[in-house]
Regions:
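Bacterial extracytoplasmic/cell-wall-associated proteins, especially those involved in peptidoglycan
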Residues: 2-164
Length: 164
């Protein structure tokens, strides 16, 4: 798979960085650099925790799944041919199960997300900026789950937490 013009790398050449870049792009597009890095740091904190999956892609795509109606209607279909999709509102990161395309448009925001992801995976660049946070939400929402969390603080357009 070749790298598209305007992309620094693709999902084949750098899969973990690509997953992280997608999450940065869809979760913090329009935020400042610190906000994007903090969103990325939450993923890295989860990878380091025994409570979450062990890779960036597994953390980003952690969800509850259901079989697609397209394959569910065929009882004799081999398991390897069945299609599963994430259940809406049952993903760790909302963009992954919103039903929209997960292909980012090529542009400055995507290139910045790819740069941040690459640097955070391959160096100590801004690692720790979220101060150990494993959860966050946008400033304009107030989810029920945050009542059970310890507030870390606000960075950019998100509020960060760690489990008590």
């Amino acid at each position: 798979e070749s790298v598209s013009v305007g992309e620094l790398y693709n999902a084949t050449s750098h899969p973990q960085e690509y997953c992280l870049a997608l999450n940065i792009y869809y979760e913090s597009r329009g935020d400042n650099l610190a906000g994007k890095a903090a969103v990325s740091d939450v993923v890295m904190n989860r990878v380091s925790s025994t409570a979450y999956p062990n890779t960036i892609c597994e953390v980003v795509y952690q969800a509850r799944w259901k079989e697609s109606w397209k394959t569910k209607q065929y009882p004799d279909l081999d398991d390897s041919e069945r299609v599963y999709i994430p259940i809406r509102h049952r993903c760790q990161f909302s963009w992954f199960c919103d039903g929209k395309s997960d292909e980012p448009p090529i542009g400055d925001e995507w290139r910045q997300a790819q740069t941040i992801a690459y640097r955070m995976v391959n160096s100590d660049y801004l690692i720790g900026i979220a101060d150990g946070a494993t959860h966050y939400h946008a400033t304009y929402v107030n989810p029920k789950w945050n009542k059970d969390m310890l507030l870390i603080g606000r960075i950019g357009l998100h509020i960060f937490y760690v489990q008590r």
